[in-house]
Amino acid sequence: MSEQKDRAAQIAAYMASDGPLTPFHGEVPPAPKWFTRTVAVQPENAFVEVEAAKIHYLRWGDRSKPGLLLVHGNAAHAYWWSFIAPYLAQDYNVAALDFSGMGDSDWRKSYSAERFAEEEMAVCEAAGMFAVSEPPVIVAHSFGGFITMLTGAKYGDRLAGTVIVDSPVNPPGRPGGPPHRTFKPHNVYPDMAKALSRFRLMPPQGCKNLYIVDWVARHSLKQVEGGFTWKFDPFIWQDFSIGDTAARLRETKCRIAIFRGAESILMPPEIGEYMFNLLGRAAPVVTIPEARHHVMLDQPLAFVSALNALLADWNHSVPNRRI
């Protein structure tokens, strides 16, 4: 309990400090050419209805190619993948979704892991990923990885595989999960500069690629009366349960791989080893050097290279067994 209290105090201090974008006063940080080139690639913007909610997704590439669904984490959105997707779209029909209550998707009165899993499958369907001979792969970060563990357990017979990115399944007795949350409406900030100054990565971490932090922060905001506020529903987690992630991991019906950031506070080596054992020591655990929890933000090009290598292996080999 004291560890949870200490963590909550650390997060409170982190949230009270100046955000990493404060020194830019609303200006866009300088970015390398690879980044400006990839985000200039315009995806298809589309929606699919799932249980009376419009689910937004972005899509890149040729629909005749194998499908690759990219899934964001807690309170995030599809644009977390928009500087990654164009590299993958050379070989895949790539889509990135906004879960309900996040990004540009509709909010719901209540949320569940099962409904989020349905949203993943609905976007795969809408993006044409089940219209080709090869089933799709889902790549999912953080909270999205927990949902994709359920998707792999329930719908894995329709998937070629899942890649779980820094989504820790903790052994019994190890403290885990978020600290106590306060549920209240978002603040409204008078201008974009002030709103950007309040953006933080969670769990607390730095990121040297501030041009990426700025990109995802801008796409996290919407204009409302009086200024700008966050897009995600602040009440998503009020009655939400993630369920038994260890059981779902073991029940996966398709190929699976685990990615972790070498410097991630959520997935130290022993957690990767624990998940490796849960999967019968038959699924790869890939470590991205110099990356913290937000692997794609910290080391985007290394992440692309590692993912392409994994997918190339999956495309040219037959698993000894389904995990």
What are these regions (language model features)?
Residues M1-F47:
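An N-terminal hydrophobic leader/cap segment in hydrolases
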Residues G176, P190-G243, A247-R248:
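Conserved alpha/beta-hydrolase catalytic His-Asp/Glu region
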Residues V50-A53, L58, A95-V139, S305:
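Active-site loop/oxyanion-hole signature of alpha/beta-hydrolase fold enzymes
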Residues A53-D104:
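Conserved HGGG/HGGXW glycine-rich cap/lid loop of the alpha/beta-hydrolase fold
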Residues K253-A291:
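Conserved loop-alpha-helix segment in the C-terminal half of the alpha/beta-hydrolase fold
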Residues A140, G144, T148:
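Gly/Ala-rich beta-loop-alpha elbow adjacent to hydrolase catalytic centers
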Residues A291-V304:
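Catalytic histidine-centered segment of alpha/beta-hydrolase-like enzymes
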Residues M149-A153, L159-M192:
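Flexible "cap/lid" loop of the alpha/beta hydrolase fold
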